[in-house]
């Protein structure tokens, strides 16, 4: 206790000294353990059975207590005493859903501020803290149970947290169940899971299953476990199965084996529609769960002579490369390549004899740009034309957002002095239609585009050619694909960049740029419009490829000089700001196409015979 004494003796007037009023003083009393002392006094009252003003009536016992303690500790009791409730005036409340042991444990905690949570009593404390709305105790129980989640109790904890409204425990238990789903779905506890919790499990991208077929089997098994009461839920659960990721054979088998159940629950037509969808647009759905897919980096290069082609893929999981069979991709000079689902789209380019090297291509006197769009299906090793763009274009960029392919910038057919295109188009792979969207705010050359959720960022230069060829990076646009709106951002990079020497990549919905001239990586904060230095990589060739995958950036190949091309591959781990070198490409390359693509494991065309 700290005590400051006032030396003045008059309360209503100031003292004087030789006719001069003295300065008035203040008293401050601070007792750091005041609250604990009050608790101790109240606990003494409880032990002495004095000053009680309220009673909790149990089935087998009446427990006296103090209103102030109940109201201070429990939102349930505070609300009861604040509102004009019968219990407030009667001075008692009857509680039937808690045991006397639980209520006494609560009162011990309320009067002392102390309790011990154990494996034996945690559920009791969790129940009473939920009912009596004791937030601190509820959080303590939740934290205790989160640390104990395992394969034996996770389903029970998921159910408990759902019943008691503990968001934190529910989220942790749900994540654990989703991660170990394939080990749990055959258990008895799983079959007793309620509809709402099962629905939350199934809708997650992170559901860890080896194939989507397992999700369909789980839905059917859970429904049949108590068919009479659960069949009404089947249409809702079927919607959570990504039916278009299943094979046609699997869907046909489901129709044959479950015809009666599907028809009685109005799900037969849902499966029929999925079969039509798979037949007509199989491989064009990018929503496969990560656990059901294999991810690759796809590399393609056509030499200047237009005849020699090099195509290979890198398996992310196994850190291994595979040289792919001849695909005969028609990648014209100045064309752009983007992946979508299990397909690859090539747009535009020059039909004439333009040089492929960007430095020489840009200086050609005439560009015979095409409006053609090609689709490559690696599963069938098939390459075919789809709908043409509205405007021929070359030296543009393409990127996927909101399940559509956007083509941005570039130049159309004509002489070299034609300005860059402002027109922007988007292609729907399912409807096979091109539409025009809002145009660019102004012209841009050497565009680099990356998608972060629904936003497309485009970086480039406002000039095409400078004396040193390397134009500065001075254009920075943002396009909201959901609202079809462009905005121009201030390119405050903090230092000078060359437009042709940076690579823009998305990592975990954050935009990064890799500067191939200074070997540095920067991330962009959309709230402040500021670029932040994230670290440096050891080296990188000019014209290297760059790809963002999950929390990693891959930088591949490139050239240090016309006759010095590298096959090196470096990986930047953004979550720990570290670089490492992984398996090199099968061949040294510069100025090549580089995209991420993934396949359902059951139809992965590149899985076997991977070579390091």
UniProtKB/Swiss-Prot annotation:
SUPFAM superfamilies: Kelch motif, POZ domain. The keyword rRNA processing does not apply. It holds the Pfam family Kelch_1. PROSITE patterns: BTB. InterPro entries: BACK, BTB-kelch_protein, BTB/POZ_dom, BTB/POZ_KBTBD3, KBTBD3_BACK, Kelch-typ_b-propeller, Kelch_1, SKP1/BTB/POZ_sf. Transmembrane segments: none annotated. This is Kelch repeat and BTB domain-containing protein 3. It comes from Pongo abelii (Sumatran orangutan). The lineage of its organism: Eukaryota, Metazoa, Chordata, Craniata, Vertebrata. The gene is KBTBD3.
């Amino acid at each position: 206790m700290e005590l400051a004494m006032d030396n003045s003796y008059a309360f209503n007037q100031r003292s004087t000294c030789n006719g001069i009023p003295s300065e008035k003083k203040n008293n401050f009393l601070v007792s750091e353990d005041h609250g604990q002392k009050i608790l101790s006094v109240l606990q003494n009252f409880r032990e002495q059975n004095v000053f009680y003003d309220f009673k909790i009536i149990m089935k087998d016992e009446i427990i006296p207590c103090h209103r102030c303690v109940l109201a201070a500790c429990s939102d349930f009791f505070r609300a009861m005493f604040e509102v004009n409730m019968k219990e407030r005036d009667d001075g008692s409340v009857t509680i039937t859903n808690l045991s006397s042991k639980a209520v006494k444990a609560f009162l011990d905690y309320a009067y002392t501020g102390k309790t011990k949570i154990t494996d034996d009593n945690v559920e009791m404390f969790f129940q009473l803290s939920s009912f009596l709305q004791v937030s601190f105790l509820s959080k303590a129980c939740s934290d205790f149970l989160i640390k104990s989640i395992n394969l034996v109790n996770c389903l029970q904890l998921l159910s408990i947290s759902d019943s008691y409204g503990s968001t934190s425990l529910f989220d942790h238990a749900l994540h654990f169940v989703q991660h170990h789903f394939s080990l749990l779905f055959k258990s008895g506890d799983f079959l007793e899971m309620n509809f709402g919790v099962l629905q939350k499990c199934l809708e997650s991208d992170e559901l860890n299953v080896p194939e989507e077929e397992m999700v369909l089997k789980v839905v059917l098994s859970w429904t049949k476990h108590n068919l009479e009461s659960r069949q009404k839920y089947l249409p809702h659960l079927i919607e959570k199965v990504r039916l278009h990721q299943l094979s046609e054979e699997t869907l046909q088998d489901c129709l044959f084996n479950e015809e009666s159940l599907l028809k009685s629950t109005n799900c037969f037509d849902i499966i029929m529609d999925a079969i039509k969808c798979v037949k007509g647009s199989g491989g064009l759905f990018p929503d496969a769960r990560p656990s059901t897919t294999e991810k690759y980096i796809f590399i393609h290069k056509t030499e200047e002579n237009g005849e020699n082609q090099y195509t290979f893929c890198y398996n992310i999981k196994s850190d291994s490369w595979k040289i792919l069979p001849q695909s005969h991709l028609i990648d014209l000079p100045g064309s752009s390549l983007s992946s979508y689902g299990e397909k690859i789209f090539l747009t535009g380019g020059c039909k004439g004899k333009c040089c492929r090297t960007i430095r020489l291509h840009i200086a050609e006197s005439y560009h015979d740009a095409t409006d053609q769009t090609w689709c490559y299906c690696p599963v069938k090793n098939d390459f075919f034309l789809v709908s043409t763009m509205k405007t021929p274009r070359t030296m543009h960029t393409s990127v996927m957002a909101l399940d559509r392919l956007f083509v941005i910038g570039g130049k159309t057919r004509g002489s070299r002095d034609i300005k860059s295109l402002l027109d922007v188009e988007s292609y729907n792979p399912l409807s096979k239609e091109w539409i025009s969207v809002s145009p660019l705010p102004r012209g841009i050359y050497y565009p680099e585009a990356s998608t972060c959720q629904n936003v497309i960022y485009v970086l480039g230069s406002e000039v095409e050619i400078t004396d040193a060829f390397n134009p500065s990076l001075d254009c920075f646009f943002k396009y909201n694909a959901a609202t079809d709106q462009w905005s121009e951002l201030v390119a405050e990079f903090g230092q000078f960049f060359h437009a042709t020497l940076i690579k823009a990549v998305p990592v975990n919905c954050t935009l990064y740029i890799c500067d191939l001239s200074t070997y540095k990586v920067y991330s962009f904060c959309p709230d402040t419009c500021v670029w932040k230095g994230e670290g440096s990589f050891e080296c990188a060739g000019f014209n290297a490829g760059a790809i963002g995958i999950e929390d990693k950036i891959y930088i591949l190949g490139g050239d240090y000089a016309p006759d010095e091309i590298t096959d090196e591959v470096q990986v930047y781990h953004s979550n720990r700001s570290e670089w490492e070198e992984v398996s090199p490409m099968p061949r040294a390359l510069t100025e090549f196409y580089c995209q991420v693509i993934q396949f359902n494991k059951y139809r992965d065309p590149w899985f076997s015979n991977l070579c390091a």
